[in-house]
UniProtKB/Swiss-Prot annotation:
Binds 2 Mg(2+) ions per subunit. The lineage of its organism: Bacteria, Bacillati, Bacillota, Bacilli, Bacillales. CDD domains: Trans_IPPS_HH. This is 4,4'-diapophytoene synthase. It comes from Staphylococcus aureus (strain NCTC 8325 / PS 47). It comes from the Bacteria. (2E,6E)-farnesyl diphosphate 2 binds at residues 45, 165. Belongs to the phytoene/squalene synthase family. CrtM subfamily. Changing residue 26 to A: Decrease in C(30) and C(40) carotene synthase activities. CrtM is not functional in a C(40) pathway, however independent mutations on Phe-26, Trp-38 or Glu-180 are sufficient to permit the synthesis of C(40) carotenoids, such as lycopene and 3,4,3',4'-tetrahydrolycopene, although there is a decrease in the synthesis of C(30) compounds. The combination of mutations at Phe-26 and Trp-38 appears to be harmful for the general performance of the enzyme. Upon coexpression with Erwinia geranylgeranyldiphosphate (GGDP) synthase, CrtM produces novel carotenoids with the asymmetrical C(35) backbone, such as 4-apophytoene, and the production of the natural product 4,4'-diapophytoene drops dramatically. Its cofactor is Mg(2+).
């Protein structure tokens, strides 16, 4: 195993640890593509964790500087400051793919702002956040998952990322409240007459369910729009993207089956993932 192979393996371990659903799906890509996904995922994870986990603004600055070095001089040797193994893997990807570096910087800017979290006044602010933390990831992955990326390809990948982030929010309402965060907008909380603290303490009510389903309907519509345009991605990537997205959309039904609980994180079990795998395998005859 070469040193570069070890770098990609390290990135893969990060992805498997933090997103079993993504790993389950994207590990089925051809080798070069899946390695690129591992590297990009690992970079995005380190960006996300720099503040939330490490509480280290300097580490986030180092990540940004390392990415800028790769963008400016992709073929030069660099003394990376953040995580050398991840950055070497990213540099290798950047030498072969047209990486949308600005999307990395947009993600970093969102993480900077997230240090001083305040509730969103409107849904427009919430959806802007979903772009910043996840739509950006879709943009960065676009050259890996398509043969000839176009404006439409970037738009579809961006919308998929935003949809998956909204599903994360719908899954983690209670966990986020424990961490003193409410991502639903004040505008929509007022409209549906919902107080998350009250729901957390006293249990789910019809107002909360209506609010939750309002956002779920948005995520489901975006998911369907992506599925309707999935052919913008490469033939190899189409079944993989559909598998990852369908595993994620299944989370919404898991929340429903758990009676919208705020006190337990739901997940899609291996049996259901395997069922989705076989359904999509039959559809595409490829995986």
């Amino acid at each position: 195993m070469t040193m570069m192979d070890m770098n990609f393996k390290y990135c893969h371990k990060i992805m498997k640890k933090h997103s079993k659903s993504f790993s389950y799906a994207f590990d089925l890509l051809p080798e070069d593509q899946r390695k690129a996904v591992w590297a990009i995922y690992a970079v995005c994870r380190k960006i996300d964790d720099s503040i939330d986990v490490y509480g280290d603004i300097q580490f986030l600055n180092q990540i940004k500087e390392d990415i800028q070095s790769i963008e400016k001089y992709p073929y030069e040797h660099h003394h990376f400051q953040s995580d050398r193994r991840i950055m070497m893997a990213l540099q290798h990807v950047a030498q072969h793919k047209n990486i949308a570096f600005q999307s990395f910087y947009n993600l970093i800017d969102t993480v900077y702002k997230d240090q001083h979290f305040t509730m969103f006044e409107t849904d427009a602010e919430l959806f802007g956040y979903c772009y910043g933390v996840a739509g950006t990831v879709g943009e960065v992955l676009t050259p890996i998952l398509s043969d000839h990326e176009t404006h439409q390809t970037y738009d579809v990948a961006r919308r998929l990322g935003e949809s998956l982030q909204l599903i994360n929010i719908l899954r983690d309402v209670g966990e986020d409240f424990d961490n003193e965060r409410i991502y639903f907008s004040k505008q929509r909380l007022k409209q549906y007459e919902v107080d998350i603290a009250e729901v957390y303490q006293n249990g789910v009510n019809n107002h909360y369910i209506d609010l939750w389903e309002y956002y779920a309907a948005i995520a489901e519509k975006d998911f369907q729009d992506v599925m309707d345009q999935i052919k913008v991605f490469s033939i190899e990537a189409q079944p993989i993207i559909e598998l990852a997205a369908r595993i994620y959309i299944e989370i919404l039904d898991e929340v429903r089956q758990a009676n919208y609980t705020l006190h337990e994180r739901v997940f899609v079990d291996k049996r259901k993932k395997a069922k989705l795998f076989h359904e999509i395998n039959s559809k595409y005859h490829r995986i």
